Amino acid sequence: MHAPNQISLAAKASGEPEFREVGLGPWAETHPGEPRPDDLASPNYDVRFDSALLDEGDRRNVLDRYRYWTVQAIKEDLDAHGRHDFEVAVENWTHDFNIGSMVRTANAFQAKRVHIVGPHKWNRKGALMTELYQHVEHHPSIAELVECWHNRIAGEIAAERARAGVAALKAHAIASAHNGAETGAGNGSEGIIGNSGATVSSHVSALNAVSAVAEATAEIAQVDARIKELEAARIIALDIIPGAVPMETYAFPKRCLLLFGAEGPGLSSKALELADDVVYISQFGSVRSINAGAAAAVAMHAWIAQHAATAA
């Protein structure tokens, strides 16, 4: 029998560690004397709060601003604030334990959607229930996923073009109506005269028309920019293969689908075939690759570093 390691003995004698408590206890303890937000008679009533969590406390892995909220309320709030434009797809052919970690990271970086490819049942252990706050879609194959994603992008482009058309028609109608009103005023059809000798109602009408046209023009510019982003959308696979591009020099498109494979085999041949680009994380040690879950986190954060604003 080996003698106890001296470091281990010293560690036991150190009195460490002391961990801080995460989350909040029951509402009555954390907010003594304050009305409960789930009480219909309370001026602080808020439908987003969960009665069970208020009773028992909230130790979930959520941001403090979501303490005591229902799962649905949190999900709706994330949607309302706007999720990021990247999506995550994970191949589930081997029931890899890393999938849960990838889903958790996708939640942390507020991915628009998570796609599980392959069997419907996946290893949720590492997700720590974060999938409840995500939009998760299932696909039987990579081919079906890619077709679905391209169709969604095409649909969004069509919707944006329709929006641009409506804005252009609105601007044209406002300008035409204003020009017609000015013509009438020039013929003496307007009434009220201001101190400057100009027609007051015509002046106000002109300002309103200019403002409305400017708003419509700005909307058209926003739509054009959005269409360019959608047209530049790409499917990006993460794997180390000949011809892959180092992530450190890769410019991630704002709208993209990130493909991740399983620990060991990596991505399937079909996934690599259908991807627009393949990127890899540069390795400087002796190993060929890092853990699949860690690699996915690095890739998602690379997108965040290039496109996302700093979190509040």
Ranges and model annotations:
Residues 1-312:
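Post-transcriptional modification and biogenesis factors for structured RNAs
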